[in-house]
């Protein structure tokens, strides 16, 4: 939007982006979790934000922004990609890998020594975004998204594409 490359898009809703983009209500949530080794002493979310805990995170991701705003003691180690963050974790350079549930499920499927901490630490809200300043378009799109969520279309689409276990539907609409 800022570069005038696109007018409308499916994008994660978050505070920094909301300065230049208007968002609809979310239509899907992508849960963000922490992954640890099964032998880790870190077993619950409350254990994560502690001195000496290192967390690999993809820089500038929506969950990186959330972690930056919400963690006080743990150290974030930023990587340029999920592959790089996964390597930091796999090579024992960090104690935790933060990521979106779909990617972490793939990691756990490939390594029985890894486990995901539940519940999620945050959810990335996927929404439709448009350039600020078009309230009529925003109202139309927001009503459309709310209808697609409430009438079950979004849920049916997730099931049809076999991603319903990786994503969730917002329940507050």
Predicted region positions:
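Acidic, polar ligand-binding/catalytic clefts
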Residues: 1-49, 115-120
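Hydrophobic residues within well-ordered alpha-helices
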Residues: 1-2, 48, 88-90, 128, ...
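Beta->alpha turn/N-cap motifs
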Residues: 4-16, 38, 59-61, 81-82, ...
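A ligand-binding cleft/hinge motif common to bilobed small-molecule-binding domains
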Residues: 11-20, 69, 90-122
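Periplasmic-binding protein-like
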Residues: 28-39, 101, 105-146, 164-173
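Short helix-initiation/N-cap motifs at beta->coil->alpha
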Residues: 42-43, 77-88, 124
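Short loop->beta-strand "edge-of-pocket" segments that line small-molecule binding or catalytic clefts
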Residues: 46-61, 75-76
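Ligand-binding clefts/hinges and TM-proximal coupling segments of bilobed small-molecule sensing domains
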Residues: 62-79, 116-117, 146-173
């Amino acid at each position: 939007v800022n570069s005038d490359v696109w007018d409308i898009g499916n994008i994660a809703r978050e505070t920094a982006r909301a300065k230049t983009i208007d968002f609809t209500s979310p239509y899907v949530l992508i849960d963000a979790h922490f992954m640890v080794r099964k032998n880790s002493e870190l077993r619950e979310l409350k254990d994560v934000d502690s001195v000496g805990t290192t967390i690999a995170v993809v820089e500038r991701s929506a969950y990186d922004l959330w972690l930056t705003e919400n963690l006080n003691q743990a150290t974030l180690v930023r990587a340029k990609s999920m592959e790089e963050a996964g390597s930091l974790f796999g090579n024992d350079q960090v104690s935790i890998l933060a990521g979106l549930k779909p990617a972490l499920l793939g990691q756990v499927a490939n390594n029985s020594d890894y486990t995901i901490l539940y519940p999620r630490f945050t959810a990335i809200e996927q929404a439709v975004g448009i350039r600020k300043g078009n309230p009529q378009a925003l109202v139309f799109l927001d009503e459309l998204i709310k209808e697609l969520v409430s009438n079950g279309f979004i849920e049916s689409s997730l099931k049809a594409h076999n991603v319903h276990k990786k994503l969730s539907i917002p329940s507050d609409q």
